[in-house]
């Protein structure tokens, strides 16, 4: 399979979970991994550079030998920039974290990315910091209401098995 995985990250625990899942998918599918950090428009140069440095450290902490990994720091609205990055890279999928039902901000971002993305979207729930845990199946629906890491695309409920064993 030729292509890339776009993974939206920030400094949250849910982003670490999304990054872990994206790394696992990148290895399993042989896809290039691109971490994308989005900062607000009008961000000062110092803040932008600090975000780039933190992303570089994040990548160093989460990198695996043998996987092709890149990073981008973009300015703008997270959903807009993630969708644009996926379009620019002709991505095979986008991976984003979700803060769960109590956070409407990232929840709304993951929902907006799912609606507008040119490719499948994996929404990683809180508590998935271990990535592709062999004890968990991944499932989801278009609006991300299901538990487990989910894939959403234009049609209904999608279930996929990433080497998970059912219990």
Question: Which positions does each model-derived feature cover?
Answer:
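Charged docking surfaces used in two-component/phosphorelay signaling
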Residues: 73-81
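Active-site phosphate/pyrophosphate- and oxyanion-stabilizing loops and adjacent acidic/basic residues
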Residues: 23, 56, 111
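Glycine-rich phosphate-binding loop signature in dinucleotide/nucleotide-binding domains
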Residues: 85-91
